[in-house]
């Protein structure tokens, strides 16, 4: 028996059941515009994790490169509802294992999807999403008017204010300067508790189709800001201190975290708003996503101070 358990823009995920046997079938869409192949990214990254003897991830059973399908071991468990320190420690251990004796030279892998290799990249990942939302919501229907109003009143002025701040602090040359390859870390990219399964006091990590080399600060920003879960202020401080202890030598832009975090906060508001396109025929779903974006912004806008 095969049943679909997830439908998204980038892939379809199915659960295969036969008596006591279970496996995950992941089918990657080939017509979705992207710089990298999500199928190859996940396949290569899972093979890399296997070589590193990292076992708390799915294992490849079979793959079909032509059809862009991977059969994976099924991981039983449940999502984490409340983030605790022991969960954060497990996340840190996972990142440390991935990067232990791993360098850009001995693992010639691609950059992560939306990798940020300069201060300018962090700014653009937000700016591009804002621009795309303005272009997508030009219609005069009720939801488009709400989105455009929200973008004009809250998001754009916030972005412009941070942009002024960052331009005062850095020269254009400094903003465009790329990080040295040795300053990057290997990132699962879409890393957070939305992609973690909890089973028998152990965390299992899934979904590596965006993985690659990235600025360590981007991992921190996305891990802290993902709207699907909440990490307390104290736990964020705990995680950050431990992260710096592990990757300290690579955190060349650590003093810039406060500014960079602001751009990624606005980016995440845009990410939520962009989900409206996936449910464009369902007015109630669209309204739900819009409310989620507004609530997320209002709840966390102290970040912009």
Task: Identify the residue ranges that each predicted region occupies.
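ATP-binding pocket architecture of kinase catalytic cores
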Residues: 4, 14-138
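Active-site acidic catalytic loop and adjacent metal/ATP-binding pocket
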Residues: 5-20, 24-25, 164-219
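Activation segment
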Residues: 77, 203, 211-213, 226-229
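An alpha-helical support segment within catalytic cores of ATP-dependent transferases
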Residues: 103-189
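Short amphipathic alpha-helical segments and their helix-coil junctions
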Residues: 161, 166-172, 200-202, 237-256
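Active-site activation/catalytic loop segments of kinase-like enzymes and analogous catalytic loops
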Residues: 216-249, 262-281
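ATP/Mg2+ or Mg2+-diphosphate-binding catalytic cores
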Residues: 270-305
